[in-house]
Amino acid sequence: MITFQIPSPFVECLEASRLLLERYNLKEAIIIPSHEESSSKEMRQAVALEGARYLQRTISDKDVIGVAWGRTMNHLIQVLNPCQKKDNTFVSMHGSIPHCQYNDVGSLVSRISMALGGQRFCFDTDALMRSKEELTRFLNMEENQKIAFLLKRISVSVSGVGSLYPELDSPLLNNNYLQQADIKALQAKGVYGDILLRFFDENGEECETDLKDRTLSIDFDTYRNIQTKIVVASGKQKAYTIRAVLRGELADVIILDYELAKQVIKISD
């Protein structure tokens, strides 16, 4: 008699995936083994590798792929297989962040389009405008209409997520993107995290501050209509943030390390 034994870490990951799929409205939950000796950068790279593999398995010719900024996204794009080119369109889902060269969405969209082939479209300006009126004027400019059109036709998106609860752990805070007054206003609204430069509360609903109306980014209603929203994250400190993402249906596919997944399950609804 032939028997097959799955190593224990993979059994735990499969069980965590099953529980998350059971409790939340997800298409897939991919959980990768965690190692106590692994650094946060190594775990970020590990989930990014799985994210790259999943993205390349998922996309088809003619897909419009939405791309976000971030450290995990930077690692994900580095490990894409350039032999698997398709006829896709890549579009930035938000504007740029000052002083953020390698992780910036413009750089990432250029690199992913070179790796996988296809056209690329980016907003060529900083994401945070001075006012709602300035943002409206920018979006109404003829040269930006194509990107605004494509945002409504994204079929697959991929992003990381920043954590702002229980600790302020988002890389956005390290890039002088927000003023101290902005951070206090977000905390007063119960901020839990950020995705696509938009800030959300414990239920995955956007925080109602003036940032909402002056941020150059896909709005949550349009984002939620994307058929396949892939969110890649690592680090158990993000558990409450990921729970908020799941409550708000801001992801269809999650790719997490086991320690993070275990914490999400522990606090899940």
PLM feature spans:
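N-terminal helix-turn-helix DNA-binding module of bacterial transcription factors
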Residues: 1-15
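Gly/Ser/Thr-rich loops at beta-strand to alpha-helix junctions
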Residues: 65-75, 98, 163-165, 235-238
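Short glycine-/acidic-enriched loop or helix-start segments at secondary-structure transitions
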Residues: 76-78, 102, 168-170, 241-242, ...
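Gly/Ser/Thr-rich active-site loops/lids in small-molecule metabolic enzymes
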Residues: 170-201, 253
